[in-house]
Amino acid sequence: MITKNPMQLKAFIKNKAAEKHISAQLVMQNYMLERLLERISLSPYKNNFILKGGFLISAIVGLDTRATMDLDTTIKGFTLTHEAIRKIFTEICAIQIADDVQLEVVGISDIRETDDYPGIRVALKANYPPISVPLTVDVTTGDMITPREVEYTFSLLFDDRTISILAYNLETVLAEKLETVLSRNIANTRPRDYYDVHILYALRGADCDKATLRRALERTTQKRGSGTILTDYSEIMKEIRESDTLRKLWEKYSREYEYAKDISFDDTCKTIQTILDAIMV
């Protein structure tokens, strides 16, 4: 999108935020992540990056239904090293688009919060002076995608056009979320995992192939060494439903995000139980 000046961009952002009932900061963040994603789609690395995580979920269900502040991807076709990732992102940031935005790599570090997959965190800045927005991209490798990644058509926030990017298929998105919910059990401090399963199944459940989802879940648990959760899922879900801590975390989450306010913790648990009962028979 071409704007006359940064103030006009801020006005567009403010109007979109009001329309979606989310903060202007979230819209700005997602717009700048979109600017990065378009550059990836135009780069020689288009077929090496596979979109996943919150940004993909937001694209599937709508920004007003799921917001995120960063970008999660997995890569294929080259070794995941600091040097390789810096080189790739420097080249991607150098791609010029008529959107007034300049991107720069600020830093590279290892991801330490999770042992699910090895990863690197890329810190960037999106600049449209005086606007400067920090961006975070998590890049992993070795992800188990079942049966394979798909080409996803991504609708842009302001322009009436789309870009194409490789992404997780729906069943793999759900499988990873289900594995996270079950394996972390009552130690999970992220209510959005429950929300994501609930909203994805509510809006896209009809598009989900149960046999593929089961295979995806089995392969994900095998990859992560958590296979026993599939035989114990009913007991695990009982513990989760009875957890006061998880219930309080959900209540805080639903107060914070407008799109979750009419969904109860019991609703999310019921959805998860329904999915598991359907695929694990």
What are these regions (language model features)?
Residues 1-49, 59-67, 71-281:
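Structured mid-to-C-terminal alpha-helical surface segments
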Residues 56:
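Catalytic metal-binding/acid-base residues of hydrolase active sites
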